[in-house]
């Protein structure tokens, strides 16, 4: 099982190609609000950019918080999303320890599903799909340091 990782963000120029690829190819919409990966400044133009995306928690707190079962645990980490079951309550977003579930204006949640469609659209090779075992320590550290 592979998960999306962002090991080379120092190369990122903030072009948002990955976000647009996710929105268009995965969610079939053309809005940054519908992407499962978000790029933002680390604190100013001179400090670079950071990617906010699902860290494939095991177990996934968002799946546990979902009252309808729209979010369920994915083997290897992360979640499987069944949009038809979602009631747009936002509990999944509130439960995410790294704020990686994004709510569109009408309350629909969007999260990275670790499909890898964004990887080939990054012109500077900032993203990659990695084996679950490789990202295990990183995912554990993120959950421990989350507020």
Predicted regions and their residues:
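Flanking helices and flexible, charged tails adjoining ferredoxin-like Fe-S electron-transfer domains
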Residues: 1-13, 23-24, 28-70, 77, ...
